[in-house]
Amino acid sequence: MARTRIPDDVLSLAHDRAKARAARDWAAADRIRAQIEDAGWKIVDRGTDFALEPAHPPTVTEGEIVRYGSSGAVPSRLAEPAAGVATVVLVATDWPADLERALAGLRAHVTEGTSIVVVADGPSPAQDEALPGDDPGIEVVRTTERLGTAAAWNVGIRRASGAVVLILDTSVEPAGDVVTPLVAALADPTVGVAGGFGIVSPDLRAFVDGGPGDVTAIEGYAIAFRRSDAAARGPLDERFRFYRNLDIWWSLVLRDEGEGSPPRRAVAVPIPATRHEHRGWTALPEPERDRLSKRNFYRIIDRFGHRRDLAGPG
């Protein structure tokens, strides 16, 4: 396999950083590291030496199929005017039957002006084989490797054309029109995020089921928001590779109007849908999913732990 050529400017920055580290100028070293990462590379220190590696897998073209190495490599529609009422985003990884069940429910009850984006995030061979083929209402976007939940959501958002984006987990089976009630909720400018399942917390530390009505956050089973807000407030933090608690973080980002200003609302709206087994949870051993959940929750506390104005019903 051919090695990826390191650009001259990146290599020069790496040597400058090595000199800064030798001089114990840690601030300069950190600043240069950020420049290297912004250029799409990561630096690994090896004593006084270093190694440079691409920050993301490469984007690969196989005939007419493109597999993207990062969310940022996916062409974005966010600068274009919205077209249509909503875009539903589904992330496909390892469970083709779950994706097909969710798609069947959407197809049976699709509303005019609704498009669908399936993000095949490093799909298993079985999932890759079962991805929807030529369908004018469904776009499939593939990644080279498993990028993680936040990156997959970013991919779907970048390809969304509808004025509202609905991220629908494949464990959810629509039994009716799940789009219209959420679009209607977001017609209220005081609402920043809406969905079928909400949770509440008095302190942003412990959450319990809440709704219908005003809640603290919307769960990622069905979470809807304005495409324009995603463009203005995104992208999502891609350190959230595991799905758990990303929905809380994104809900708070969408609600936050800044300290001293009343936050926007999160509203749970009844939708005609059935929740099935969430395989992203049950497929992992309990210690591993608890570890990953805690890591994600610390990111919420780091950013919003002091924001008691965001606690309680939004």
Q: Can you say where each PLM-predicted feature lies in the sequence?
A:
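A short, conserved alpha-helix in the catalytic core of glycosyltransferases
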Residues: 181, 222-234, 239-271
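Conserved donor NDP-sugar-binding/catalytic core segment of glycosyltransferases
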Residues: 173-208
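Glycine-rich, basic loop-to-helix element that forms the pyrophosphate-binding segment
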Residues: 143-160, 209
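C-terminal, non-catalytic tails of nucleotide-sugar-dependent glycosyltransferases
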Residues: 66-86, 192-196, 200-202, 224, ...
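Short, acidic, metal-binding catalytic loop of nucleotide-sugar glycosyltransferases
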Residues: 104-113
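Short aromatic/hydrophobic "clamp" motif used to bind/position activated sugar donors
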Residues: 165
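A recurrent flexible, glycine/aromatic-enriched loop bordering the glycosyltransferase active site
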Residues: 150, 207-228, 241-243, 285
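A conserved acidic beta->alpha catalytic loop
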Residues: 120-129, 172
